Amino acid sequence: MTQFEDKFMEVQASMVSLALEYVQNQADKIFIYAIADSLYSFNLFYEIKGNIVHKHLVNDFLPTKSHIDTSLQSLLLKEGVKDVKSMLDVCQEYNREHPTEMWLIYDAKKNSLDSRYSYEGRYDKDEELLPRLEFEKWFEEVKEQDL
């Protein structure tokens, strides 16, 4: 692998690590949606014990003794945005086009990462497109597939 690919993978691994840390490594899968377009955004949801779960509801699916502090959500998202910006820095350092959207799915059981990237710049082109709505759309798609 090239240095660029190594560094790019490091940033993605950092995103996954951050997401795992939030749930104390208790998720089966992590779904990360990141944007680096006319805005920066980072959001995620989980699969825990076969349930597709928003980050603020993870305690509903974790054992009581291992509940997490959901007040850390804003810190989680801020750190995620830092990783998105790091990804941009890596792409600029190697003079590579950066993805404007990323969909990452980490399977903790298999220790595998599936990724999909878009380079379209949809948010730059469409002022009515909202990250929250696109994130919710993906959440619902995954939830329907999982049933």
Predicted regions, residues:
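Acidic, proline/glycine-rich low-complexity IDRs
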Residues: 108-147
